[in-house]
């Protein structure tokens, strides 16, 4: 398996790696330690994680990011050419070059797991930029061309009904490719289920902190509530916007308008305790991120629901359709601070239930991978 993050952790990557191991295969995850701060070799439930260091590389859509990923790709191709695997499992579009190179050189099959629409991220910092739009279009076409060589394509969302918003499966179909949705739902056992508090309450965002506008909306939404109704804001996670978000929230605390707590990166083992602090999960994103409208589903919505915590998400897209169809929370229009505030308040005492878990997704994965696994035998 190949992934361009440090896999420290990447729950989807490790979940699929463990499933491959349970199917009877030895699995090595080739991961890119961009910040060079994790063990270079690690074992997780029998899965080896091999981390590469090719110089410190920033996250984001910069030239240095692109060059760093190219160095990582070349290094992994050399490694796997020297010791060829039976299968290459490509996590996201920026690893497809590796799968295609091994297939061309040694006829090794590869699986493409499209977590996200990677080509949309380069436009995030400047969505009106013609240059970024051009580069994004080139990345998209390159991804589609390479994906056609995959033995199987997996992705992370599909529409919930014939009349709902589209997911990534439908996006692939629109571009002439077939994919199977394996959603990022957690596996039991789960952490402690939410117990509503009659006194104070907390709204949280647990995960990568990249979208400053989402936090600006959250602050505005909370400030539309009466002071005695306002929740504490809890943010946990690192990311490209984490410093700005921390500063913004601490300024509000200093001004006496909000109560907030901010912490940095956390491990997967910390997640249940973090969610246990919350009454409502905030999972809204600026729609200018193309993948939001095209079918992205926030993992934090599923993780929160597994512990009874409802979420507020974007409406007009798949995450809103799924949240409301499964009773996992409320969908609200982007940039309507009053509506977001009222949705948060309405969910304060709600306890939800995640009925479809990662166990269902495991069965879907086995069905989707059946032909590939049969070929390997």
Regions found by a protein language model. Give the residues of each.
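Nucleotide-sugar-dependent
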Residues: 11, 213, 267-274, 281-302, ...
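Nucleotide-activated donor-binding/catalytic signature segment of Leloir-type glycosyltransferases, i.e.
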Residues: 244-275, 280
């Amino acid at each position: 398996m190949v992934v361009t993050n440090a896999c420290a952790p990447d729950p989807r990557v490790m979940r699929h790696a463990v499933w491959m191991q349970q199917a009877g295969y030895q699995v090595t995850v080739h991961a890119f330690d961009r910040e060079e701060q994790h063990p270079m070799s690690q074992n997780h439930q029998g899965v080896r994680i091999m981390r590469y260091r090719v110089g410190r590389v920033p996250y984001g859509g910069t030239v240095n990011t692109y060059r760093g990923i190219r160095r990582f790709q070349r290094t992994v191709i050399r490694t796997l050419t020297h010791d060829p695997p039976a299968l290459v499992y490509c996590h996201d579009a920026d690893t497809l070059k590796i799968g295609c190179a091994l297939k061309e050189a040694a006829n090794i099959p590869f699986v493409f797991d499209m977590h996200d629409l990677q080509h949309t991220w380069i436009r995030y910092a400047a969505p009106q930029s013609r240059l970024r739009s051009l580069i994004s279009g080139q990345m998209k076409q390159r991804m589609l061309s390479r994906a056609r060589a995959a033995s199987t394509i997996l992705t992370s969302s599909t529409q919930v009904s014939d009349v709902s918003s589209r997911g990534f499966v439908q996006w692939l179909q629109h571009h002439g490719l077939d994919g199977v949705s394996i959603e990022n739902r957690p596996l039991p056992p789960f952490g402690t289920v939410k117990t509503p508090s009659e006194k104070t309450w907390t709204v949280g965002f647990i995960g990568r902190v990249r979208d400053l506008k989402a936090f600006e909306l959250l602050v505005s939404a909370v400030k539309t509530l009466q002071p005695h109704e306002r929740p504490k804001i809890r943010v946990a996670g690192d990311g490209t916007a984490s410093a700005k978000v921390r500063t913004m929230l601490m300024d509000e605390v200093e001004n006496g308008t909000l109560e907030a707590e901010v912490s940095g990166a956390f491990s997967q083992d910390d997640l249940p305790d973090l969610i246990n602090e919350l009454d409502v999960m905030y999972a809204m994103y600026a729609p200018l991120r193309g993948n939001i409208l095209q079918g992205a589903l926030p993992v934090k919505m599923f993780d929160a629901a597994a512990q009874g915590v409802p979420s507020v998400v974007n409406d007009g897209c798949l995450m809103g359709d799924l949240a409301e169809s499964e009773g996992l929370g409320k969908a609200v229009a982007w940039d309507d601070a009053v509506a977001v505030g009222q949705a948060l308040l309405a969910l304060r005492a709600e306890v939800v239930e995640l009925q479809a878990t990662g166990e269902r997704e495991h069965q879907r994965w086995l069905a989707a991978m059946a032909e590939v696994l049969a070929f390997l035998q």
